[in-house]
From Swiss-Prot:
Compartments, as annotated in UniProt: Cytoplasm
Xref: NCBIfam families: thrS
Catalytic EC class: ligase
Cofactor note: Binds 1 zinc ion per subunit.
A GO molecular-function descriptor: tRNA binding
Domain named TGS: residues: 1-61
Catalytic activities: tRNA(Thr) + L-threonine + ATP = L-threonyl-tRNA(Thr) + AMP + diphosphate + H(+)
CDD domains, alphabetized: TGS_ThrRS (cd01667), ThrRS_anticodon (cd00860), ThrRS_core (cd00771)
Name of protein: Threonine--tRNA ligase
Subunit structure and binding partners: Homodimer.
GN (gene name): thrS
Protein family per UniProt: Belongs to the class-II aminoacyl-tRNA synthetase family.
Cofactor field: Zn(2+)
Gene Ontology terms describing biological process: threonyl-tRNA aminoacylation
Amino acid sequence: MINITLPDGSRREFENPVSVMEVAQSIGAGLAKATIAGAVDGVLVDASDVIDHDASLRIITAKDEEGVEIIRHSCAHLVGHAVKQLYPDVKMVIGPVIAEGFYYDIYSERPFTPDDMAAIEKRMGELIAQDYDVIKKMTPRAEVIEIFKARGEDYKLRLIEDMSEDIQAMGMYYHQEYVDMCRGPHVPNTRFLKAFKLTRISGAYWRGDAQNEQLQRIYGTAWADKKQLEAYIKRIEEAEMRDHRRIGKQQDLFHLQEEAPGLVFWHPKGWALWQVVEQYMRKVYRNSGYGEVRCPQILDVSLWKKSGHWDNYQDNMFFTESEKRTYAVKPMNCPGHIQVFNQGLHSYRDLPIRYGEFGSCHRNEPSGALHGILRVRGFTQDDGHVFCTENQIESEVTAFHQQALAVYQHFGFDEIQIKIALRPESRLGDDATWDKAEGALRSALTACGVEWQELPGEGAFYGPKIEYHLKDAIGRTWQLGTMQVDFMMPGRLGAEYVDENSQKKHPVMLHRAIVGSMERFLGILIEHHAGQFPAWLAPTQVVVANITDAQADYVSGVTKTLAEQGFRVSSDLRNEKIGYKIREHTLQRVPYLLVIGDREKENGAVAVRTRSGEDLGSMSLQAFIERLHAEGA
């Protein structure tokens, strides 16, 4: 007798071993039709898998997160089925699930085109309409090898070679004549795969190594139903409209080019935006007791060996040589700040000592990981380091937390999640030190009265960190600020202070950043605001435009007055119709356009229009200036 315990605590008895689907059928035809897979004693299995012992069972449907993941994984196999029907000579590689979708890597003698993608998507739809069952067969390893040899699937054979010899049987999933190996589970029938869409094609390399052969990667997305798919497509379209690369080009903010991969060319308007953020953060430094410093871009590798970066981070560093000495271009600012601290003696009465730097760093990110200004090789951080005693950790972290929240809210971010990244496998120091560091962060957040999520294994090699994850206007989450507790690096680099007993001790070092990479933060700001920055932040706050040449001198005077007041303003004196000027500057998302005609010139006034098209009417220049000040500009 087999006893199956369901999530509500009820039990069902079966005389013989029973499949997940058979249990679902015993509950009801509707549930059986909706069944995708099962979780037996917490382990995901196929609907066809047989339970031969007393167990707990949760039926997985498309309403479950796991169900949607299974749908996506099965859609990847469906890509394989369609591709092999259309292009029999290609070689299938691997097709995993990723966030909100899936991809399949394929070796093809020629690159796939958009027309190919459309044909593949069409064939997938035709296969789904056939409403066929997906059949799972556990198959001996030797037989699997013979199956893929007969089909010429060289990459599948390589993947089998990589598997442990302990694996002597594999799940083979049959989509009619097409077969793929997988741990599973997969959907029992193609009717679950109707809400899918192929999204793009890109290049990839076998095993992610650029020295290996290039593959074609087909990306797609799949959901529980058409409604979810349509909502996703709408969200992606909105994200494309907000893409910082697109807006950066439209508004002439920056550009990137092949000769400098991962490095940004800032144009005047983009640099104006940068300066607004930098000066704002500089004020935060000053108000929080940070002394701003500036440290060298390159340092001898001996320092990076002492700091631990050489052993733990050198693959991400750039190096250069001069006069038979090897130098590293700094990937982080912390070792430099310790050198500043080490100049002179410090008493416990001097602590905490806080240094801040808009430090330019370089990291050798893989070219495939680069993405606009969100993922770059050269970047500037609002980097700060606090040298303090153990007893001061909680108060410093608490103060930073309150400060970070205030900054995020000022930039328009109200939904903030807090996480603690805990010790990684590759790390400095012993467990007792890590226990102390992680405990200090938990205590500080408890004192702040906030909830947090913990991320095992995601801390830096020298210490755990608090992470601030911000939700943007379309619901995407971005990781920005960090606060890290470091008991390691001060000792490795000889940082000391004299305690109340006249003994030399190593300070605790707190690594903190609020916006993190300036480049990345600006990219996020562009997308969050869709280029429509609040007046205080906009690279150009006001454009003053004349209707005819008769107002040119007055326009120049208004522009000069606003510039002298510290506003970012430009004039448009071109011989164009005013309607054309209004449209152009509205598309540039300039917050305010001042239109000057004869009436405004005679009355010493300005006619004010907003980028949304609202006509605020005529007002004195002083009244307009007061309006800007009221908006924080």
